[in-house]
From Swiss-Prot:
The keyword Transcription applies. GO terms for biological process: lactose metabolic process; regulation of DNA-templated transcription. The gene is lacR. Repressor of the lactose catabolism operon. Galactose-6-phosphate is the inducer. Keywords: DNA-binding, Lactose metabolism, Repressor, Transcription, Transcription regulation. Coiled coil: none annotated. This is Lactose phosphotransferase system repressor. Residues 20-39 bind DNA. Pfam families: DeoRC, HTH_DeoR. Residues 3-58 form the HTH deoR-type domain. One of its GO terms (molecular function) is cis-regulatory region sequence-specific DNA binding. It comes from Staphylococcus aureus (strain NCTC 8325 / PS 47). SMART domains: DeoRC, HTH_DEOR. PANTHER family: GLYCEROL-3-PHOSPHATE REGULON REPRESSOR, HTH-TYPE TRANSCRIPTIONAL REGULATOR SRLR-RELATED.
Amino acid sequence: MNKHERLDEIAKLVNKKGTIRTNEIVEGLNVSDMTVRRDLIELENKGILTKIHGGARSNSTFQYKEISHKEKHTRQIAEKRFIAKKAASLIEDGDTLFFGPGTTVELLAEEVNHHTLTIITNCLPVYKILLEKQTAHFRVYLIGGEMRHITEAFVGEMANAMLEKLRFSKMFFSSNAVNKGAVMTSTLDEAYTQQLALSNSIEKYLLIDHTKVGKEDFTSFCQLNELTAVVMDYEDEEKVETIKTYIEVVD
């Protein structure tokens, strides 16, 4: 096994397991401890993993740093636009909708061109997009409260008190990570607000691109099998099939 093959194998192992110990690599690949340590440093420099005491953890499995709203606008835009167009086809005139925070939902807001809708959101960028379309029959409401600047979403007691009184025919929301059937986000505040909206919605649609599948985040706020369907891209068929073991994926 040459160096390139060895680095590739170590990357596959750490991404599959999430974390791996140095001695596991030594025994599995039959190489020296010093060789493994050099390989881990090289893979860390490439951004594939992070060295930890006695081993390494995958950078693709756990989202240790919450990505800012600005950064999200530069990632998987083509996939997100594909998802948004597909999600828009699920909306019908007369619906009362809840739109959660996230760049994919913002793109959905751009796609909406229905005549008669009521849309409630706790996300400022989503609200600004929809407000441009407001008419006597196309009504848009922003739920207030404490704003999280990294996502520009309103959460907390005030937002939750308003949500408790509302009911929706459909909810469209996104997530930072989906793993083993759990849908995850970065904070307890956003998790609880999303849970409230979900509990008050008849149909529930999760919008995610393929990069979110297999990742983990701080807390889960629902399970895939509690939803109506998932709307996602087909860039990674294996990940689509993984989601299909829990819930329908919209064609």
